[in-house]
Amino acid sequence: MASKWNWSGTKGRRTPRRPYGRPYKSSVPTTRVVVHQSAVLKKDEVVGTEIKPEGDVARYKMKKVMLTCTLRMAPGELVNYLIVKCNSPISSWSAAFTSPALLVKESCQDMITIIAKGKVESNGVAGTDCTKSFNRFIKLGAGITQTQHLYVVLYTSVALKAVLEHRVYVEV
């Protein structure tokens, strides 16, 4: 016979549809942390930044991330991006990723996991800059703890200004 107690030790509510309460795991409270960054990216260069909560958070687990990036670039240009998870910090972006396609190099394949990828192509009238953006909502499954690292990696075909904002849903 199934137990009428949940994992926290309290009895669940009885209803006509469910006369005996099922055990359920109590939800951990989450907080939302918003981080705003801006950078000027160089032409044909692979760059990246870490996605993590700022402040005095010593122990945490990230479950979800909402990523927004706004780019100002000339028409006909391309931006590739990757969101990757890694167990150790990445010191050299060009040593870990190939240049135009952002593929993980063979020497780093055992420590880098690709979570999401995409591209942004600009269109418009020649001679004027256009603003493009992308939004990604990333569910991280079991979560990423403070000992792991989450990065967004960008490759641009032209020098441009990027504004990166991310909202991190953290279990503390």
From Swiss-Prot:
The keyword Metal-binding does not apply. Residues 11-20 have a biased composition (Basic residues). Disulfide bonds: none annotated. InterPro entries: Nanovirus_coat. It is found in: Virion. Residues 1-26 are annotated as: Disordered. It comes from the Viruses. Keywords: Capsid protein, T=1 icosahedral capsid protein, Virion. GO terms for cellular component: T=1 icosahedral viral capsid. Belongs to the nanoviridae capsid protein family. This is Capsid protein.
